Amino acid sequence: MKSSRQNRGMALLIVLVIIALLSTLLTELAFSTLVDLRLTETFRDTTRAYYLAKGGVNAGRMIIQEDRNGYDSLDEPWSQGVVNYPVGEGAISVRITDQNGKLGINAMVNRDTPSALMIDRFYRLMLALEIDKWGDPAELTAALIDWIDEGESPYPMILTEGLDIPVAGAEATYYQSLTQPYLVKNGRVETLEELALIKGFTPEILRRVLPHVALHEEVKVNINTASSAVLMSLDPEIDEDVADILIDYRKEAPIKRLEQLEEVLPEAAYIALKTLGNLEQLDLRSNFYQIEADAVVNDGRRRLVAQVNKKNNKLTFFKVD
């Protein structure tokens, strides 16, 4: 009898252990199923957000293509954008910015030959942004040239406004000597974030510089969309006061003819632009635009950044965040 009770007790214990194990397994399975379902929903919504953002990019391209007048300015439909526009279960924000109102840093070197005009402009941009509080504008300019050009010798001299400024650029030797060495690019800058790899371009400097530079290789600057700092980079005679005059003028109406500058600018500034040939390097239209599309669908989020060439409607840059 005693043995029989012991056997029944042991059987009951085994059953309880099995039930406990099954309960644990079922609980874990239920939790895992919920997690998988949640992950599936998030993946689904993120995918939907991606395609919603992609639709925003395509809509931006269409808006840019519809703009066919003889000038591009900040009062046109493409510059207005949309914020949190509801679409089905989600919402989208689209922002379009002109890139020809910025300095094209890849134009600083043309087929491995540094461009004196663009080097001068970039150096003056550094001065306009008061970068000298955080770094040496001439050294930064030289480091950027060395990052782009294919030569192995550091750029030796910045020539600007009649001054010869000795500099020590940065080629392979510098980057290989770092604690965590890497290769110098010796080629075109592909993303603006890449500038963080270049000697001297600290986060503080980049915060000030990035809004005023672009990846394109065009020399001409759209004066209808250029910032005060970019306008000041165009010629030594364009100081902050002259730049403000130009910006105030275009707020009333976009500049539609370069000849209008003679009416707008002080005589010395206009003559300097015309005499030095800088007037020919200005434009009233833009070829390159950046489209930023942010989409949200429930818990799914996607951000796309694209740059488009207006001439052929082709993307020159595309990034998914």
Q: Residues of each region from the PLM?
A:
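Compositionally biased linear targeting/interaction segments
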Residues: 2-321
